[in-house]
Amino acid sequence: MWINYLVLVAVLLVGTTALAKRLRRLWAFIYGPLLLLSCISGDWLLRNLEFEDLVTATEASEAPLHRWNREIHQIFDRGVDSYSAPAGLEEMRQTARERHRNLLVATNDVEQVRVAPWHFSITRAQQSYERHGQAWSEHLGEWTAFVGPDLPTADGEIKASFDIAENDFLDALTLFPRFDLRSRVEDIFSERVLRLVTP
C-alpha cells in the first residue's frame, strides 16, 4: 500500500515540476512585453511631465516680454515729443530695467527645469529658448542705457532664435501630449509679430 502512495507522490512531484517549468516559460513570455510596455509608458509620462515644466517656465518667461511691448507702445503712442523728452527717456529706461530683471528671473527658471539625459529633443528646446532669452536680455540691456535719439532696434537674432525655439518645441511634443501642451506651445509662438518693438 505504501508503495502505491510513494509512486503517487513521485508522479505528482514530476508533474508539478513540469507544470512549474511551463508556468515559468509562460510568465517570461508575458512578463517581457509587460515590462517593455511599462518602460515605454513610464518614459512617455516622464517626457510629458518634463515638457510641461519647461512650457510652464517658458510661459512665465514670455510674460515680461509681452508686458514690455505693451508698455513701450503706450509710451510711443503719446508721440515723438513725449518719448524723446528726458522724462520719457527715463520712463523707457526704467521700464526696460524692470522687465530685464523679470526676464532674468524667469529665464533662470527655464534653465532649472530638469530633463532626463536621453530626452534630447526636450533638452534642445530648453537650450534654444535659453538662447532666445539671452538675445532678449541683451536687447533690453540696450534699452536700459538708451539716451536717444535713435531707438534701439530689435536684433534679428531675437526673431531667428524665436523661430528656432518654435521648431524645437514642436519637435519635443510627445506622440499623445498631455496637459494641453500642444495648444500651449502654439500659444507661446503665435505672437511673434507683436514682439519686436517698432514705433
Show where each model-derived region lies:
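Membrane-embedded alpha-helical segments of integral membrane proteins
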Residues: 1-20
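Hydrophobic beta-strand residues in large extracellular and virion-surface proteins
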Residues: 13-14, 65, 103
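Membrane-interface helix-boundary motifs at transmembrane edges
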Residues: 19-27
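Central hydrophobic cores of alpha-helical transmembrane segments
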Residues: 28-36
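Transmembrane signal-anchor/signal-peptide helices with a preference for the extracytoplasmic
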Residues: 38-57
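C-terminal amphipathic alpha-helix
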Residues: 51-96, 100, 138-199
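Short, solvent-exposed, charged loop/turn and helix-capping segments
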Residues: 98-130, 148, 175-187
